[in-house]
Amino acid sequence: MRYPIYIKKLILILFLFVSLATFGQSSTKFKVVLDAGHGGKDPGTMRGSIQEKDIVLDVVLMLGKILEQNKEITVIYTRKLDVFIELRERANIANKAKANLFISVHCNGVKNTSAKGTETFV
């Protein structure tokens, strides 16, 4: 599946952020929880047959593969399959892991075709 350039840029920015955040840390691994939004019975936004849950799962798996190349980072996934996980459980996964960073990936959709860009909450 081909992704717009902004998805690729987002992955690069997140990778750089995590790389810089781990620089100079103690010997403890930096724990990142990757959360692919929606899943299972919750498709998220849709356009034709394309569902948000599928796109964000692909993005999270690609990002995780990149992050796992850094031996100082432990990657924890809230889901690796198309399953529904309650929001509270997603938070529990991060809290139990004592994660340093929680990244929840979504692809918002609007009917207004002039709307463009991304949003990030830290």
Model-identified regions with their sequence ranges:
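Catalytic-core regions of hydrolytic enzymes
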Residues: 25-122
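Short linear recognition/processing motifs and adjacent strand/loop elements at protein termini
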Residues: 2, 23-26
